[in-house]
Swiss-Prot record:
Zinc-finger is among the record's keywords: yes
Protein's name according to its UniProt entry: MORC family CW-type zinc finger protein 4
Disordered: annotated span: 474-510, 527-546, 599-649, 718-766
MF term (GO), any: ATP hydrolysis activity
Alphabetized InterPro entries for the sequence: HATPase_C_sf, MORC_ATPase, Morc_S5, Znf_CW
Gene Ontology CC entries for this record: nucleoplasm
ZnF CW-type span: 417-469
The organism's place on the tree of life at top rank: Eukaryota
Keywords for the protein's UniProt record, in alphabetical order: Coiled coil, Metal-binding, Nucleus, Zinc, Zinc-finger
Compositionally biased spans, kind Basic and acidic residues: 485-497, 626-636, 739-748, 756-766
Location(s), subcellular: Nucleus
Entry binding sites for Zn(2+): 426, 429, 450, 461
Predominant place of localization: nucleus
Gene name per UniProt: Morc4
């Protein structure tokens, strides 16, 4: 069958010759492309797995223009046929939108609340539904209208259609009566004849299964079967799950470790639990809730990495960790726009593990910079995709080597791991909350609410979700980067040189970090023979190494600015004026970061009082050229000797040693106590070291030695042996220690407290300036919080207004489509009037026939009346009786033809019936 458009052929059309130069191409009588019904089946074959087809139907409910909160997947039996049902409480569709959804290639999805739609090609519902079964019915309501649409291969085969036909019937949601359009009547007839519902009442009852005033329900039957005749999906094995039929959980040996195929390959419940990177809706599978999870937050021994694609300037975060549920499953989970595309993709050492390399390691990445394939089961094989896979392989290998090199690490533990962080979704507001501490997710209730949260800040559903610190660090705004670049240019390059050291000891606890906001940075301090026991024990404990975090470097910038306000020459002058204790050169000269620790004698300052004063910063102890040969043998850790409150904390360098020793200032990063969480304890510390110009030019060597436990013990042993060989170098400390602990503490407390008036005045001005700065900072923080609250308020108002605008625009479009001015509505009215006219003509013809019969009866009666006119009374009575019966029959006839005619109180002996009959005949122009 050929379809044409427009008028006869003209120039530029087939058979009409070639178009002239400069002429406009014509579309008249050009053949239209038609779509064969067989395309429905061939299009569905793009999904190699049935779960991929189910994911397409779920994606339609997740899209931002639908915003469904709950999706129900169930199996129902209708007329002894198993049917798959998908029901959501989204926004629903108008008949016009339903027609576009059942057509091919139409997609008008929008971005809402920074959430991107998953669909791209406008083909997901057709391919997904036809992959699961041959026939599908769609029921949708949007608050004003109800609509039913049929997409059926069986229907197209029965009518031998040459193109894809989709019957759609609209109903009024108020009275559930059909809205008459030009195709509503034949569409309803087709649905009732070729679907599993044969009456309109059963069809409309399906709308009652949709919760609320809006939503959509999809019903699929004639489930696809395998070659052996069995259904592709197994509904009987597990009453709360849908499994793939005849699926064997195959096992194979990989590097001596038994590896099972993931549960997501054959269990729909497991597949739905990880289908979305951050789920935003509840899924009920066969009347039981699916425990959705953020797989990136359900791993143990988590490490983060970044990857910068070549096609975009944004950095992409990669998460690596060990699976807590299945120790023998591994691979990279690759998402796109929050949707899982490739699951358990093997990379790096996981491709061909010989000794179990990479087994148990799960990687998570969101590849929004890649383009998914047509069926959303893979990515297009481009250069960017190959570079991404290679980068994942390198980073996964590095993660595996780092974890294996750690002590007491078990790749395959005997007991179940607990995630580093436990996140749970509120059943009411659907927000994700992080629980403090390490909590086993299996111990949480099936329905969890915000008021269960032990954290007092997140006990209400109105509180926004907790922002992830690592996301803020990896995706910093350009404004912050520009500010940082400007600050770097403003620094005096001739005064200090900076070096960045990674892998320092762990950051201080939360309360210490919070106190750093109200403290200044002290000057450098050098070890002396007077050591307090608590400080010595603190300095001997080997610190742990942590990974690098850029956030620590950002927040430490404000302390660097405070130090930058005081010139270097002024600090030198203050240092030379301060009395110093002799320095023990026999001790180790390697650089070490020392945590600020102070012993408080009885009756003196307590830790609470000290929190308002200056705190001792971490230190880096330099190495001298003269003692370089001794450091190979002597590595005993130095310690600090704290002074009193009035004295500047720590000892300063003498003037004669200043040209030989580098001046080091370590800056400790801090965060606000509101924003610091458990991740900050795991985060790294970045030390920014300033080296005086004179010392840097002298060529004094700088060495950083990591503190491993075994190496540290060996250094102590070598130091003790060197001291025994050189007794004179340690005579002073030994003599000091012989006086006893009381003498040592007394000397530590009675350090000289000489301060010049100039220094005291400078210190006072600095303290006042710092107090003003802190007060301004607190004021600015309060204003920022108020502005943030106001911004959130107006943001919510804006979103509400935007939602109302979308609603009004949708209603306006629907009103235009179904208004009385629309041609479709006028056509519907014309069809109704035309049908009434046909019925009236038929009734008129029937009345004419009945009137002819009545006239013939009257003629017979008249003849009988004339023939029986005789004086005999019996004949007259019989004639009157017959006339009465005839009048009764005529009255019955009139009553059947005209139901509104009342003839109950009329006497049949009179001529009233004759008069009424004559009036009816005259009114219908029959006598003419």
């Amino acid at each position: 069958m050929l379809l044409y458009r427009g008028a006869p052929a003209g120039p530029g059309t087939p058979g009409g010759g070639l178009a002239r130069a400069g002429s406009v191409p014509q579309a008249f009588r050009i053949r239209l492309s038609t779509m064969s019904p067989r395309y429905l089946q061939s299009n569905s074959s793009s999904h190699t797995r049935p779960f991929s087809a189910i994911a397409e139907l779920l994606d339609n409910a997740v899209d931002p223009d639908v915003s469904a909160r709950t999706v129900f997947i169930d199996v129902e039996e209708v007329k002894k046929k198993p049917c798959l049902t998908f029901t959501d409480d989204g926004c629903g569709m108008t008949p016009h939108k339903l027609h576009r959804m059942l057509s091919f290639g139409f997609t008008d999805k929008v971005i809402k609340k920074s959430q991107r739609p998953i669909g791209v090609f406008g083909n997901g519902f057709k391919s997904g539904s036809m992959r699961l079964g041959k026939d599908a019915l769609v029921f949708t309501k949007n608050g004003n209208t109800l609509a039913v649409g049929l997409l059926s291969q069986t229907y197209l085969e029965c009518i031998q259609a040459q193109a894809v036909i989709v019957p759609i019937v609209p109903f009024s949601q108020q009275n559930k009566k059909m809205i008459v359009t030009e195709d509503s009547l034949p569409s309803l007839e087709a649905i009732l004849n070729y679907s599993i519902f044969n009456c309109e009442k059963d069809l409309l009852s399906q709308f009652d299964a949709i919760p609320g005033k809006k939503g959509t329900r999809v019903l699929i039957w004639n489930i696809r079967r395998n070659k052996d005749g069995k259904s592709e999906l197994d509904f009987d094995t597990d009453q709360y799950d849908i499994l793939v039929s005849d699926f064997d959980a195959e096992e194979k040996e990989i590097g001596g470790v038994t590896s099972e195929l993931p549960e997501t390959e054959y269990s729909l419940r497991a597949f739905c639990s990880i289908l979305y990177m951050k789920p935003r809706m509840k899924i009920f599978l066969r009347q039981k809730k699916v425990t959705t999870q953020m797989i990136a937050k359900s791993l143990a021994n988590v490490e983060y990495d970044i990857y910068k694609p070549t096609s975009t300037n944004k950095q992409v975060r990669i998460t690596f960790g060990f699976s807590c549920k299945y120790h023998n499953q591994f691979g990279v989970m690759m998402y796109h726009n929050n949707r899982l595309i490739k699951a358990f993709e093997k990379a790096g050492c996981q491709l061909k593990p010989t000794c179990g390399e990479g087994v148990g390691v799960i990687g998570v990445i969101e590849c929004n910079f890649l383009k998914p394939a047509y069926n959303k089961q893979d990515f297009e094989y481009t250069k960017e995709y190959r570079l991404t896979i290679n980068a994942l392989a390198r980073k996964l290998n590095a993660y595996w080597k780092e974890k294996i090199s750690q002590e007491n690490f078990e790749p395959l533990p005997t007991s179940r791991r607990i995630p580093d962080q436990t996140w749970v979704q509120c059943d009411e507001c659907l927000k994700w909350r992080r629980l403090p501490g390490m909590v086993d997710p299996s111990t949480l209730p099936a329905r969890w609410f915000c008021y269960y949260n032990p954290h007092p800040k997140f006990k209400r559903c109105s509180v926004p979700e907790e922002q992830e610190r690592i996301d803020e660090d990896l995706h910093r705004s350009k404004a912050k980067q520009q500010v940082e670049a400007a600050e770097k240019k403003q620094k005096p390059m001739e005064s200090d040189k900076y070096q960045v050291f990674s892998n320092p000891p762990k950051t201080p606890p939360l309360q210490d970090m919070a106190e750093l906001n109200d403290k200044t940075i002290g000057y450098e301090q050098i070890n002396s023979p007077s050591l307090l026991p608590s400080v010595r024990e603190e300095s001997r404990s080997p610190p742990r190494l942590k990974s690098l975090d850029s956030s620590a470097f950002q927040i430490s910038r404000k302390y660097k600015l405070i130090l930058g306000e005081e010139p270097v020459e002024k600090r030198r002058k203050i240092q030379t004026e301060m009395p110093l204790s002799p320095i023990d050169y026999s001790m180790s000269g390697f650089y070490r970061r020392v945590e600020a620790a102070t012993a408080y004698p009885e009756g003196e300052n307590s830790p609470d009082k000290c929190s308002s004063e200056r705190s001792t910063p971490p230190h880096l102890i330099p190495e001298y050229p003269e003692s370089n040969k001794h450091t190979e043998e002597n590595r005993e850790a130095p310690a600090l000797c704290p002074g009193s409150q009035d004295q500047d904390q720590g000892f300063l360098l003498p003037e004669e040693l200043e040209d030989q020793m580098p001046k080091l200032v370590a800056e400790e990063s801090n965060r606000s106590s509101e924003n610091i969480d458990k991740d900050m304890n795991k985060g790294p510390f970045v030390a920014v070291v300033g080296v005086a110009k004179g010392v840097a030019d002298s060529g004094a060597p700088i060495q950083l030695v990591p503190f491993n436990r075994e190496e540290f013990v060996g250094k102590r042993k070598r130091a003790e042996s060197w001291k025994r060989a050189n007794p004179y170098s340690s005579a002073a400390p030994a003599a000091t220690a012989g006086k006893g602990k009381d003498c040592q503490d007394s000397r530590s407390r009675n350090m000289p407290k000489i301060k010049t008036p100039k220094e005291s005045e400078e210190l006072k001005r600095t303290t006042e300036k710092l107090e003003r700065v802190l007060a301004e900072r607190n004021l600015f923080q309060q204003k920022v919080e108020e502005l943030e609250q106001e911004k959130n308020h107006w943001h919510s108002e804006y979103k509400k207004a935007q939602h109302e605008l979308v609603t009004y625009s949708t209603q306006e479009t629907e009103g235009i489509y179904w208004s009385k001015k629309h041609m479709g509505y006028r056509q519907a009215e014309f069809q109704i009037l035309k049908a009434e006219l046909e019925r009236t003509k038929e009734e008129k013809q029937e009345l004419k026939e009945k009137l002819k019969e009545t006239e013939s009866h009257l003629e017979v009666l008249q003849k009988a009346q004339v023939s029986f006119r005789n004086p005999e009374g019996d004949d007259l009575e019989r004639a009157l009786a017959r006339l009465t019966r005839l009048r009764v029959h005529v009255s019955y006839l009139l009553t059947s033809v005209l139901p509104h005619l009342e003839l109950r109180e009329i006497g049949y002996d009179s001529e009233q019936v004759d008069g009424i009959l004559y009036t009816v005949l005259e009114a219908n122009h029959i006598l003419d």
